[in-house]
Amino acid sequence: MARVCQVTGKGPMTGNNVSHANNKTKRRFLPNLQSRRFWVESENRWVRLRVSAKAIRIIDKNGIDAVLADLRARGELA
């Protein structure tokens, strides 16, 4: 399973670990992904999504129905 948010599309970024001596080594910054179930009242069922913490805030603000409609319009959800 890819480390990508299904709502926002956020994925891993690359950067550097920087030591006190300013030595740099490559590293990955992973998104804060959570597997969450959301109750969809209009469909009377649970929907399981792998979402970032920001996506949970977006769902709280706009509602799960609006977010699912956007996902279906983009063709990312059946």
Swiss-Prot record:
Q: Name one Pfam family in it.
A: Ribosomal_L28
- KW Membrane (keyword) present: no
What ranges does the record give for the region Disordered, renumbered to this chain? Answer: 1-21
Q: Which InterPro entries does this UniProt record tie to the protein?
A: Ribosomal_bL28, Ribosomal_bL28/bL31-like_sf, Ribosomal_bL28_bact-type, Ribosomal_bL28_sf
Taken from the UniProt entry, a GO cellular component term is:
cytosolic large ribosomal subunit
Q: Biological process (GO) annotations?
A: translation
Molecular functions per Gene Ontology: structural constituent of ribosome
Query: Highest taxon of the source?
Result: Bacteria
The record's similarity note reads: Belongs to the bacterial ribosomal protein bL28 family.
In terms of NCBIfam families, this protein maps to: L28
Q: Kindly provide the name given to this protein in its UniProt entry.
A: Large ribosomal subunit protein bL28
Q: What organism is listed for this UniProt entry?
A: Bordetella petrii (strain ATCC BAA-461 / DSM 12804 / CCUG 43448)
Query: What would be the name of the gene that encodes this protein?
Result: rpmB
